[in-house]
């Protein structure tokens, strides 16, 4: 019985985090979601309170279907350089829910909102140092006029318990985006 307690507690934490979910895209159409997306903002509570968040370069993501798996190629800024990462995702337990397995562990990825043509809001839940961690990301198909997408992002992240100080608008620096674009161009 004592050995079950940590797992029950972990399950409760995951359940509480999942219980804060908003309205997930019900009739999710993966074929409309495929393609190139710019990462223009994110929400996270991982930062140290009171410290200014340094500006980060914009990231990007390419979503493809390969052999019945969702193939994600992403680029993002970490520390002082761009990181290019390729992962696959399997369908989760509902529409717009996916499981991503990486060396560092599993992540649940949920498409919270999208109109497929201009923006997508993604909710990512993972276990970090034994604690459930949630990050929400705002992706856009273009770099132009994302006011409505940012408004929707602020509203949804607020509904999920993030404050304005947890939101980060990424710097309009395409260094990492170009890494992804050149990797895509060099594929056979």
UniProtKB/Swiss-Prot annotation:
Residues 1-19 form the signal peptide. It is found in: Secreted. SUPFAM superfamilies: Lipocalins. Disulfide bonds join 82-176. The keyword Cell inner membrane does not apply. Belongs to the calycin superfamily. Lipocalin family. This is Epididymal-specific lipocalin-5. It comes from Rattus norvegicus. The lineage of its organism: Eukaryota, Metazoa, Chordata, Craniata, Vertebrata.
């Amino acid at each position: 019985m004592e050995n079950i307690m940590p797992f029950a507690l972990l399950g409760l934490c995951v359940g509480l985090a999942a219980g804060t979910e908003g309205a997930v895209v019900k009739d999710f159409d993966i074929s409309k979601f495929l393609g190139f997306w710019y990462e223009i903002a994110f929400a996270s509570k991982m930062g140290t309170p009171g410290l200014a968040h340094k500006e980060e370069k914009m990231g990007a993501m390419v979503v493809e279907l390969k052999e019945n798996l969702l193939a994600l190629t992403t680029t993002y800024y970490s520390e002082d350089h761009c990181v290019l990462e390729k992962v696959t995702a399997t369908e989760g337990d509902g529409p717009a829910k996916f499981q991503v397995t990486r060396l560092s562990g599993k992540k649940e990825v949920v498409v919270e909102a999208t109109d497929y043509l201009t923006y997508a809001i993604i909710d990512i839940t993972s276990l970090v140092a034994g604690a459930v961690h949630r990050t929400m990301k705002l992706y856009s198909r273009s770099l132009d006029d994302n006011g409505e997408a940012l408004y929707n992002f602020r509203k949804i992240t607020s509904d999920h318990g993030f404050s304005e100080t947890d939101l980060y608008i990424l710097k309009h620096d395409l260094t990492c985006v170009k890494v992804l674009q050149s990797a895509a161009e060099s594929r056979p």
